Amino acid sequence: SVVAPVGLDHTDMLGDTLAEIATEKAGIIKPDGYLISAAQDPEVATILLDTARKQNAKYAFEGVEFGVVERDRAVGGQLLTLRGLAGEYPDIELPLHGEHQGQNASLALAAVEAFFGGDRALARDVVLAGFAQVRSPGRLEMIRSEPLVVLDAAHNPHGVRAASTAFKEAFELSHVHAVVGILGEKDALGIFEVLREEYVDSTDATFRLYLSASDSSRAIAPEELQEIALDAGFDENIITVYDHLDEALAIAMENALFEQETAGVLVTGSVTVIGEARTLLAQPAQESTAQHNAEPEELAEAAE
């Protein structure tokens, strides 16, 4: 049983508090099984640990039994040394950006080790080959380079913070143009507060918001998003509202192109928004890669 970082998301189904959500997540821990957990809030970790003990299940937590030993930026991603349940694995090339993706890699590694009993290391060549082939469409996915356009499907405050940290580390831009659309059941205020903290309060880069919506019936109207963004502390002078996503993308890209290599466009806030953006900005077939081939509808079903 593998548990990723638990945050406040899907509260309509899982509960309104971390404790309630953690209790739901703990339901996947099977008798005499094996719990592999990411680093968690102490309250969440306690619930998971108590459940594992009641189920007589083995358990391992990131940062205790396994984790990232060393992490360095690399072209197209990062270079990792991971500590698993049964060994250490240096010089792993992971073609994904962000500290959180390194942590996800350690979680995946420990899960596979646990599947094989957790008492022997995996073959190094298999580990290297496996991570080298990792793709995560819609997660800091660069679909254009002139201007830079990056899609990220983060749709809750926790995810937006992780993606923002990784985006700033990977691309080091002085001008960020963010095209944002959010679905109605999500914590829009929390998302905007994180965006303000990450791009306005803690960086010298200029930042602009282009608020729009996908075609989903669940999408928050752009005008309502503007009010929420203002409540989150954004200056109205850096906000523009667009009824149609294609217009928001076109203007953001035009502005980024004018600022050349120091600028980029980030599309985020909802899987439906980045799915539609991918369709609108689809590259010619000869330029496509395996990372860009997932259908927007499949992404939306899987992640929202």
What are these regions (language model features)?
Residues 214-218, 287-304:
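Short, flexible loop segments at boundaries between secondary-structure elements
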Residues 27-35, 170-176, 205-208, 235, ...:
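Short, surface-exposed connector motifs at secondary-structure boundaries
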Residues 38-39, 53-73, 94-99, 126-133, ...:
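Beta-strand->loop->alpha-helix junctions that form or flank phosphate-binding loops
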